[in-house]
From Swiss-Prot:
Organism: Kali turgidum (Prickly saltwort)
Keyword NAD: no
Swiss-Prot/TrEMBL keywords: Actin-binding, Allergen, Cytoplasm, Cytoskeleton, Disulfide bond
Compartments it resides in: Cytoplasm, Cytoskeleton
Keyword Cytoplasm: yes
InterPro entries: PFN, PFN_euk, PFN_sf, Profilin_CS
Subunit: Occurs in many kinds of cells as a complex with monomeric actin in a 1:1 ratio.
Protein name: Profilin Sal k 4.0201
A single GO molecular function term of this UniProt record: actin monomer binding
PROSITE patterns the record matches: PROFILIN
Purpose of the protein: Binds to actin and affects the structure of the cytoskeleton. At high concentrations, profilin prevents the polymerization of actin, whereas it enhances it at low concentrations.
Tissue localization of expression: Expressed in pollen (at protein and mRNA level).
Matches recorded under Gene3D superfamilies: Dynein light chain 2a, cytoplasmic
Lineage: Eukaryota, Viridiplantae, Streptophyta, Embryophyta, Tracheophyta
Main location: cytoplasm
Amino acid sequence: MSWQAYVDEHLMCNIEDTGNHLTSSAIVGVDGSIWAQSSNFPQVKPQEIEAINKEFDGPNTLAPTGLFLGGEKYMVIQGEPGAVIRGKKGPGGVCIKKTTQALIFGIYDEPVAPGQCNMVVERLGDYLIEQGL
């Protein structure tokens, strides 16, 4: 399966048969290279990926400044140190799951709930980790 198919079929999927979908998603190498993305995923800057990787290496580096994606600021909320970063911005937010080689991004807006986004992103991330990726 191609990386684009993972984005199209597993991240941009119909969530729990509700007819709702993530706003955008991507699979990005930990080096910042884009492996696959939805058409409307923000253009992420190298320094934004560096800051995300730094947060995974040592939590609480993003909390004071916020998480930036494509210049948009998200308030960092509870995550799982070294594994998941979650951010909130207005009625939407972001979930980022780290695997061995990649970062899985899911961005959502209402009516998608934070827990639904987390489930979609983390399920794919856990699968990729099981596959050694």
